[in-house]
Amino acid sequence: MRLREITPDEVDELQELIESDPGYTERITGYPPGPADAQSLLMMRPEGLPEEAKVVLGAWEGDQLVAVIDLLKGYPDERTAFIGLLEVHKNYQGRGAGAAAYRLLEEYLGSEWWKLRLAVVDTNAEQAAGFWSRQGFEPTGEVTPYTYDKLESTVRLYEKPVTWSHPGLEVRRSGIAGQGLFATKAISKGEVVSRLAGRKVSTAELRELLKSPPVDTITLADDEHLVLPNDPRPVIAYGNHSCDPNLWWIDAVTLEARWDIAPGDEITSDYGTSTGTDFEMVCNCGSSLCRGKVTGEDWQRDELRERYGDHWIPALLNRIKG
């Protein structure tokens, strides 16, 4: 299956997909598909959204359009991509085509966005809510009335945070260890360099995952950890440890520049500021402040508390202030 933009010349293929599953259209409009639905899907976008921000993507197997995704980039804000719909051809439903199309969408979006957002109409929730939950989306709690001609229902918003990394980063060989992360352009002090997202697991689950490295993780709470995706592995996961890093934490998932970073500088964080108590690692970072060993108990060190102030993940900061 491959994903690409649907062109106006392919409106007939899009219309055939829409008409293959009339129940979908009926659940969200109250009417069966109309002859111009495909053309409308290609054209419609929220008022004020520029034309280039809307993309209608097709997931294809050969010449067959298997699924369609309506995507709004930078809506409702510049850090969000909004999924208007994901509809699967009737003949391909129940075969994993929707999940496969969604995975292709995440690859297409890359690391440009902080979160994905979508709306589920209650009249379609039985079919849609479970699917989106399995893809990692969670309800935001925002609920609004929904009206389409005679159909009256309710819309519930769902979101999924995604790992975002500064565009001025690249992976290459590191003098610290293996591959590292390097700046390709200047990054100013206080500028956000990455926001992490992934799957939340318990300590017991994490121990099992760590038996099959690499596993990129940070601690969220005493028994809750965030495991980053590994296929593909996000760019920020290649960031090495330093005992005098140029990044530090400003909340549970966000890293910002500790000082001005020049092109060519290696991007680092202090693993001791974001790990659980079981963690232990020999350090060869080369910094004049290298402590030789990094552990999950480093939050107790007075010199680190003074150096980083409040720039620890919340789970460790709570212990420091406890």
What is each stretch, according to the model?
Residues 5-91, 102-104, 108:
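Acetyl-CoA-dependent GNAT
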Residues 89-91, 95, 123-124:
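Active-site acidic-Proline motif in GNAT/NAT acetyltransferases
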Residues 99, 123-141:
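Conserved active-site alpha-helix within GNAT-family acetyltransferase domains
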Residues 109-121:
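Conserved GNAT acetyl-CoA-binding A-motif
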Residues 118-129, 146-151:
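Conserved beta-strand-loop-alpha-helix junction that forms the acyl-donor binding cleft
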Residues 164-247:
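Catalytic cores of histone-lysine modification enzymes
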Residues 241-322:
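C-terminal SET catalytic tail plus cysteine-rich post-SET Zn-binding segment of SAM-dependent SET-domain
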